Curated annotation (Swiss-Prot):
Molecular function GO labels: alpha-galactosidase activity
Species in which this protein is naturally found: Parabacteroides distasonis (strain ATCC 8503 / DSM 20701 / CIP 104284 / JCM 5825 / NCTC 11152)
Protein name as catalogued: Alpha-1,3-galactosidase B
Primary gene name: glaB
Membrane topology per record: Lipid-anchor
Compartment(s) where it occurs, according to its Swiss-Prot or TrEMBL record: Cell membrane
Amino acid sequence: MKWYLWGAVVLLYSLFGSACSTEWRYDLSAYGLSPVENVDNAPAMARALEQIREKCEENQTIVVTLPKGRYEFYPDSAAERVYFISNHDQMNPKKVGLPFEGMKNMVFDGQGSELIFHGRMLPVSLLDSRNCVLKNFSIDFKHPQISQVKVVENDTVNGGITFEVAPWVHYEIRDSVFVAKGEGWELTPGSGIAFEGDTRHLVYNTSDIPVGVRGLIEVSPRLIKSPRWKDNRLVPGTVIAMRSWERPAPGVFLYHDVNTTLENIKVHYAEGMGLLAQMSENITLDGFSVCLKGADDPRYFTTQADATHFSACKGAIISKNGLYEGMMDDAINVHGTYLKVVRRVNDSTLVGRYMHPQSYGFEWGRVGDSVQFIHSSTMELIGARNRITAIKAVDQPDYRGAKEFEIRFENTVNPSIHEGSGFGIENLEWTPTVLFSDNLIRNNRARGSLFSTPRQTVVENNVFDHTSGTAILLCGDCNGWFETGACRNVLIRKNKFINSLTNMFQFTNAIISIYPEIPDLASQRKYFHSDIVIDANEFITFDRPLVYAKSVDGLVFTNNIVKQNKEYPAFHWNNYRFYFQRVIHSKIENNYFDEGFIRERDVLEENNGYDI
């Protein structure tokens, strides 16, 4: 089989090479880009990329180079675009620093450059492009919207916390309220994440904390007393990232692309996700990181949300050799989006709606796409698969900005599917295979990784180090986030889990949490997830729960090593190594537990009368 694969690679290489026999090189310094401090490179970059795009042809490769340096970009003169981006606030228009659009066979090489952005911007976008590589640069913002402070004193007797504001944070105390400020924005933080000052781990059993930003007394510049802030867990030296819940734009945005590689890119901050890819095919991340600037970086945080996020993509997603740390959500999230059925027009036509306020306005499906239908209360499939023969936006001229689509199907839709009982439509065409390997995930909020795709998913050779919540989540939800779908082929092998689950967040029932949202589990007769193998991993943990699973047909846990420590007190409500709800065809064999394994003590099975 390897010889066949190698032959296919050689054939593809020869075809691609013959199609792109001419190489054109463009040095962006010739277009006026300058690494001089306070020089705005946004207009020159926009002009350069537009001129280069016009020269893209099928039979040539374009290499665009940026001489190594520190380049600044300001929003006022940047390219302006209307983008509807999955899982982000739909704030438009957006100011884009590097708008790559309509590119073919293009390599952008930053040669180690630092790209520094001001205000609120979308740093890099790649749209409607094919066979493109972005590599060798970093993304950061001059004034992040997250305000970092350090606890100097905590009066646990009388109450009140005194904190020091990091030197790069612009702020004022306005009518005794902390107001963070930047170019074109200001906000008062509403929540915070607490980090241990010496280790950078999230503080044990804190999760999202309220922050004392009102009724303040400024003792001296950058030294502030908050008399009402009472939290004994925040000892002096604790570093707190005070934040809002806004996420206007990611660091990198991919849309309608085919065959994209992101290589040796570091995102140090973005107000949304590090990378958001939607409706794109075949994406490779190699050395793409959302990370600090090394061990001496005074910052403790990176992105406001997920490090990487893939919504309604297809082909292969490969993510390897990355470092993900300090972000406020998952290192990777792969899913599609259910449309909720809001009207049955006739027996072959339905109207479906995007339901989450951060997920609408982008293309959902195309003629010929295969779909299936699901009952949201039980998450069971209803009727047979079908195929789209026509799709149009209902509330907009086209899909841009649309929330509702009228969809005509090839065959009659099951008569039980209508607007009254909660049904979702899942697009099966836009579902990828996933390889997530050789990554380091550490010191982040929420979860380490999240996968919701029916195609093969392999998670291997990763280190999940103090991910604070669940390390791996297999989800599926047609009720809140409306993120598809069922996992049918998952292999989790040769990973190392170090003290995950020091905090509680959504869906964090164990280190590996298989947690579809099923409101009426008691009425479910089928199973949502299937064929999940957890093999040859090492778990180093202070607490009990290893695997939680709900509605699974086929779960294997073999050849794993479990080591117990006392680095934190056990606190999780789940006291079982394995907690199964409606799980059949499960196997737990050939594992090593340094404290032993007793099935009656370590396994809880709730199957509602179904056989195990």
